[in-house]
């Protein structure tokens, strides 16, 4: 929920107990490893253990928690008394989804530090799985309410109280939580309604859901709509449930996720409940917090929370989908694809998971597999445009431009949104590359009409006009506008330099093309452009150097032939006639 995101941004002290003091150079959260751990490992057990320790650390540093956990398991099996290995091993096992093993290690951790937040949260999840709600409450009592724990602990405590038969106490706890921070109204309303509904108190559930919706403003969550619509349908308020779902659909017209509820109501049935037990409620709490940690780019913490949620609801499509998203961001594509592959394809999340699987196949250079999957999806749901659009993107990137145009045409036929500049832009690119300029120009102009200041459109259309020698003054102004918006984009800088070159302003062209090469040093076209500008600026040796450099960067065969001719003194750049030159 939007409001929960705002709250988390304000209270996070990285209090899950697994965050580092800073970020790794790549932007990924740095793994938590004290230097003393490393030195201690070396001194205590020698090089074999040291190697496994380093292997575990390296796997963790690149986000491969499964491998890191395996190395840590070997290390612990051989050296159970190694200093602090239980804490590290517990974190890695939880990150890898090996919750049973993580819980065993958590027992060791709390034996040395009974207030360790992550270990106690893992043991709380295990207690919920065992329906031991008093044990869950005991573990939650040990967690200090700092950072994100100020949200997740009260939510989990409410569910444990409800599981222990203390529904009134659970609902009061959630009301008190709202009183401390009104922005938590949506999530406390949702969970209060779920607890009351599950405990057989429909009137209290209705009141809680109503408060939650009021607190949500225009950002009512899917879970809220699903849960409240189900309650209304069971309470013989079918029409009110339908209106609730219709209102959500109006503000979220493209989503499939509401489809099961909408279909059930259309058939006069009661939608499936959001939760069927108290462990489900705990999982829902963990999932909500994991989702917002992920949005805040705190992926290491999000991964542990979602793995705990998955332990409580192993086949949850929503949980598996979020797990896949987090793993993708951690560059663990194969593991992410396993998560996506575990989602029932008949569910709405199964549709989105297959879109992500197709993208994964493309990334793995299995484009044919991605294309087959997307074509099957296009046939499966003839009313949807997203699979056709993805197919167009994949084919365009693979330079299969005519096929890409066909896929984009299908997407347009199915799209309810005629004001999507991105679709006009991407089809315009494919059309231009397929040498269908008239259609391409119409699409690019339409994209520009819809998004007048969009730098990508300004640059592409402007560059295309320059290449054709059309509308040069307007093209230059468009590209200058794009440069102002994206000054660090080497391709846009190249477009401006090339525009100046085509206008005969070689000194200014050189300045801008040198900047473009500095931003994108490995692009053969930009280096070739700079070579041409150097040549006409009278800097012949530098021109030859740039052309030679361009050849080393494996340009397309046609471009390569032109560059080789220039190096042989053939087809050399020719200056623009003086009468056609324009000042900047």
What role is predicted for each listed range?
Residues 57, 91, 125, 159, ...:
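Residue-level recognition of tetratricopeptide repeat
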Residues 21-89, 95-104, 114-118, 138, ...:
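N-terminal leader/linker segments that initiate helical-solenoid repeat arrays
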Residues 85, 119, 153, 187-188, ...:
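TPR alpha-solenoid repeat register
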Residues 88-89, 122, 156, 191, ...:
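Canonical tetratricopeptide repeat
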Residues 78, 111-113, 145-146, 179-181, ...:
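Structural marker of alpha-solenoid helical repeat scaffolds
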Residues 61, 95, 129-130, 163-164, ...:
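Register position in tetratricopeptide repeats
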